[in-house]
Amino acid sequence: MRQIAIYGKGGIGKSTTTQNLTASLSTMGNKIMLVGCDPKADSTRMLLGGLNQKTVLDTLRSEGDEGVDLDVVMQRGFGDIKCVESGGPEPGVGCAGRGIITSIGLLENLGAYTDDLDYVFYDVLGDVVCGGFAMPIREGKAKEIYIVASGELMAIYAANNICKGLAKFAKGGARLGGIICNSRNVDGERELLDAFAKKLGSHLIHFIPRDNIVQRAEINRKTVIDFDPESNQAKEYLTLAHNVQNNDKLVVPTPLPMEELEAMMVEFGIVDL
């Protein structure tokens, strides 16, 4: 069982990428569980035909510890993928990161991590790598980390910060598997992300071009793999899935100092001095 966490700046398309990646892997015959670790609880919606399933934390609040059953918090979606949303605390109360810790512990106790699973994916909010959001890394749950980024300043800044957190918790066995570029059509984007990944000691595992079919699929409450499996964009996600499945380059990243990061952004024309 490979346990993989997908991190990335909010709004980067992390959940869309993760759902299309897991859908692609399922078409290759893999058995998968996807755990949404984002308070927005939108990590599995396209796999479930637009269903907003009940989150683990909402269920705990309404039913208590004794009232939670696995079939209440876990739904099966496209490709028979097991879908779970950890959810978040009530607004203004508690810590969303702690919710991830609670959810994963509950899933373990309920026997969700079955031996037949090939992959468990964690879709994690990644603007900050505080203790709770780092939990899949820190506790050694996820051994492989992929970061979704683009050629925009804040996306790369967030990716670099995530690598700082990953390097800190590397003794638990977690490694960076690569950078996934979810393109924003920025000039020189592929070259920038390739250079950034190499400076981290890693690689650009795939460049996903921008395509409006992603939005059309989401309007129809489906992944691209489900909506139009013969499309060019579906082939891009399938290539990503093959690259992840065959990836053996797992490293402890070397995050860039801020001066070097800014110099690289200037070199590629992303920011002006």
Swiss-Prot record:
[4Fe-4S] cluster binds at residues 95, 130. This is Nitrogenase iron protein 2. It holds the Pfam family Fer4_NifH. Belongs to the NifH/BchL/ChlL family. The keyword Ribonucleoprotein does not apply. It comes from Methanosarcina barkeri. PROSITE patterns: NIFH_FRXC_1, NIFH_FRXC_2, NIFH_FRXC_3. The modification ADP-ribosylarginine is found at residue 98. Binds 1 [4Fe-4S] cluster per dimer. Keywords: 4Fe-4S, ADP-ribosylation, ATP-binding, Iron, Iron-sulfur, Metal-binding, Nitrogen fixation, Nucleotide-binding, Oxidoreductase. GO terms for molecular function: 4 iron, 4 sulfur cluster binding; ATP binding; metal ion binding; nitrogenase activity. It catalyses: N2 + 8 reduced [2Fe-2S]-[ferredoxin] + 16 ATP + 16 H2O = H2 + 8 oxidized [2Fe-2S]-[ferredoxin] + 2 NH4(+) + 16 ADP + 16 phosphate + 6 H(+).
